[in-house]
């Protein structure tokens, strides 16, 4: 945290980033008329045309809402960060990381094809890791940043597999074609696609059982928490669910999975939020509640449920960013975020108190805030879903607990008798007040003018992106109906929970203590994984070259064997009639047997040389004298080099057990058999003579050479041959250096 009065040359970075984000906001806002009119704004740049992949972007109703929230709140966050930590010695680096994260989020929500979306999806994981672990001297920050990245990156791997399967099933990666094309639900790949996509979305948006990483991410500086947990990273998962709803939604598997995960996350997070004494931690759990609610609503297929999901997304972004910045201002002005150590701050911090009260009114769902409309829509949408009674019960429970938490955040710190704090309470600098004040007032203004300001934008998201025929209206008064009754019930239960919060803690704490900790489970999993990696390293990294070759050839044998078994290749066997050729084969095999069984290095070298000479003779029989000559030269040179080296080495001693010898022999036979079968299969296949004919016709004309093999090696493939020569030359230098050093050591 920074002393806002201290001058620092890094502060202009924060102001510049805020202005740039505001300009991006204006640019996106200019697309509103076209998007509302049903004309998405498109941009594409060929990236890998041969693979059907382009760097494509699109501004439609859904991406418009996310783009406005990301850039608008981002502009205020940069300004807030300038006041909060503007004189931090690494503030410039912080701004760079935060701006890179904002660009990554914008790329994610504006992406028009799956590959582009995944690229920016992974960039958000990387940049959020840098932000959460910004205080890299703090072990807790490093640990929690790594946890967040591993969980979300693990989900990202699943998501990549899901996208590849989706592109295979749909015949391309273009989102517009996937969403409007034939239903993926009828594809045999729908099940795997759904599982993989939901894994990616649930890990990113911290849905149960992957919710544990999000509260730990509070180790980040407050500007990061305010941005990541309001409109950006944690919303990426629900954005993906909303974006793919037309293609994957509407099935029982989709509805049950999303409704269950969302409801469990919302209720559990609301209960945990009530038990937090740190204001920042309480807000983290309320973020989980909001994400669970949105996920639960996206399980539905009715326009009311989807309108509620989109509207509540906006509601949560406005009040949550404001409240996180309020908590940072309280921490700045008092030196603590603990609820029990705060009280009566309204007099010393009137602007902060006003912003907190307005934002908490929206969080509690009270009129005339936009939160009231969002809560009414939640109940209206829940009533249209499969298993409506259970969904409504979960929504009422979560919202009532949120009402109580909002009461704690709004009333306990700012009203009542003053309580002594580590610092004399004082208002934060203007940079830290602008953001929470603007967003809190925005929740009021948008609530009063919801339909004129948001109706067409939300409607375009429903009709243009989610492919619904209509959207629900956004009205402060929708009549005396079921949603209104449920709202009154929510207020009554919430007020009771606030008044009985100590009794609530007495009832809930024993249950929570008996519940298994997924965070501790994650640590146990990492410990087990490290032990597994250490065991694997001990098994494979033995320091013996034979063990490494054994592992490589075993994998090759399995891969080739699977290819042979599954491919069922056709084999044409034609045995030679030449007695001399059979004698050569026997001579070659005898050399291999000698090399394997001798205890003399010289004899082993002679055996290997015999194999090489035998192969050269076979080349002569095959009509390739040039290749045979090359083979003889290489074998002769190799034998001489090996013999020179062998003079400096001790004799061979067999240290392998009988079992290891048998294993090595089995792998060698398996590789040899598979390679033989594949070579026979290739020779039995029709030969495409196009390249051969080209060399025959052009070797003399273009290269003026009569020997086609030589021309291919030194003219047509000159660079390949040159590269091979360099490799051999470098290897000889290395061997010479080793032998020379060995000789000096012996001297």
Predicted regions, residues:
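Alpha-helical transmembrane segments and their membrane-interface junctions
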Residues: 362-377, 440-461, 541-567, 678-689
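Flexible extramembrane loops and terminal tails that flank transmembrane helices
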Residues: 565, 572, 576-584, 593-596, ...
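Cytoplasmic/organellar membrane-interface segments at the starts of transmembrane helices
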Residues: 161, 346-354, 402, 406-494, ...
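Hydrophobic transmembrane alpha-helices and their helix-loop junctions in integral membrane proteins
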Residues: 76-117, 126-428, 562, 577, ...
């Amino acid at each position: 945290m920074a002393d806002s009065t201290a001058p620092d040359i890094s502060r202009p970075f924060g102001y510049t980033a805020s202005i740039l984000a505001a300009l991006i906001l204006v640019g996106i806002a200019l697309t509103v008329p076209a998007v509302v009119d049903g004309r998405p704004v498109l941009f594409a740049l060929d990236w890998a045309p041969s693979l059907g992949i382009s760097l494509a972007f699109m501004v439609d109703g859904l991406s418009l809402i996310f783009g406005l929230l990301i850039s608008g709140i981002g502009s205020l966050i940069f300004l807030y960060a300038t006041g909060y930590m503007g004189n931090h010695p690494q503030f410039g680096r912080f701004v760079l990381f935060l701006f890179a994260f904002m660009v990554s989020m914008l790329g994610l929500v504006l992406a028009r094809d799956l590959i582009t979306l995944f690229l920016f999806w992974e960039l958000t994981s990387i940049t959020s890791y840098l932000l959460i672990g910004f205080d890299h001297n703090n072990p807790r920050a490093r640990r929690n940043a790594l946890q967040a990245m591993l969980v979300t990156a693990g989900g990202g791997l699943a998501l990549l597999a899901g996208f590849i399967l989706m592109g295979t099933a749909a015949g391309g990666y273009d989102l517009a074609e996937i969403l409007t094309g034939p239903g993926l639900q009828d594809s045999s790949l729908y099940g795997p696609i759904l599982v993989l996509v939901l894994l990616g979305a649930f890990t990113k948006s911290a849905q149960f059982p992957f919710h544990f990483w999000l509260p730990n991410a509070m180790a980040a500086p407050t500007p990061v928490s305010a941005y990541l947990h309001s409109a950006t990273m944690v919303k990426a998962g629900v954005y993906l669910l909303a974006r793919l709803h037309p293609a994957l939604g509407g099935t029982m598997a989709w509805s049950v999975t999303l409704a269950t995960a969302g409801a469990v996350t919302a209720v559990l997070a609301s209960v945990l939020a009530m038990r937090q004494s740190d204001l920042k931690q309480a807000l983290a759990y309320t973020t989980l509640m909001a994400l669970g609610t949105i996920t639960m609503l996206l399980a539905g297929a009715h326009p009311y449920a989807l309108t509620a999901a989109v509207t509540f997304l906006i509601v949560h972004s406005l009040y949550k960013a404001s409240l996180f910045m309020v908590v940072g201002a309280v921490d700045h002005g008092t030196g603590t975020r603990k609820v029990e150590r705060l009280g009566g701050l309204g007099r010393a911090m009137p602007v902060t108190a006003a912003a907190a009260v307005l934002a908490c009114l929206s969080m509690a769902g009270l009129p005339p805030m936009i939160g009231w409309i969002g809560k009414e829509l939640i109940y209206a949408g829940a009533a249209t879903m499969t298993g409506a009674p259970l969904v409504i019960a979960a929504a009422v429970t979560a919202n009532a607990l949120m009402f109580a938490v909002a009461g704690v955040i709004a009333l306990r710190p700012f009203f009542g008798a003053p309580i002594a704090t580590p610092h004399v309470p004082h208002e934060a600098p203007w940079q830290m007040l602008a953001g929470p004040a603007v967003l809190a007032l925005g929740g009021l203004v948008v609530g009063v003018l919801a339909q004129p300001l948001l109706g067409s934008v939300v409607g375009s998201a429903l009709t243009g992106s989610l492919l619904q025929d209509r959207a629900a209206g956004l009205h402060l008064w929708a009549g005396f109906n079921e949603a209104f009754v449920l709202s009154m019930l929510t207020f009554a239960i919430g007020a009771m929970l606030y008044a009985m919060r100590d009794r609530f803690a007495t009832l809930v704490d024993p249950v929570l203590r008996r519940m298994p900790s997924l965070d501790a489970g994650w640590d146990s999993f990492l410990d087990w994984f490290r032990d597994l990696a250490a065991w694997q390293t001990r098994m494979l990294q033995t320091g013996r070259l034979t063990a490494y070759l054994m592992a490589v050839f075993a994998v090759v044998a399995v891969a080739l064997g699977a290819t042979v078994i599954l491919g069922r290749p056709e084999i044409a066997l034609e045995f030679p009639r030449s007695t001399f050729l059979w004698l050569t084969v026997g001579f070659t095999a005898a050399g291999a047997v000698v090399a394997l069984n001798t205890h003399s290095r010289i004899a082993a070298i002679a055996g290997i040389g015999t194999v090489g000479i035998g192969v050269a003779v076979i080349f002569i029989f095959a009509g390739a004298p040039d290749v045979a000559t090359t083979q003889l030269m290489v074998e002769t040179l190799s034998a001489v080099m090996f013999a020179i080296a062998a003079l400096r080495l001790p004799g061979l001693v067999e240290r392998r057990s009988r079992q290891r010898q048998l294993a090595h022999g089995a792998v060698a036979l398996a590789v040899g058999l598979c390679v033989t079968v594949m070579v026979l299969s290739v020779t039995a296949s029709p030969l495409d003579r196009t390249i051969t004919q080209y060399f025959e016709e052009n070797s003399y004309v273009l290269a003026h050479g009569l020997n086609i093999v030589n021309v291919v090696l030194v003219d047509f493939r000159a660079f390949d041959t040159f590269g091979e020569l360099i490799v051999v030359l470098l290897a000889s230098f290395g061997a010479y250096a080793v032998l020379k050093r060995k000789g000096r050591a012996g001297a």
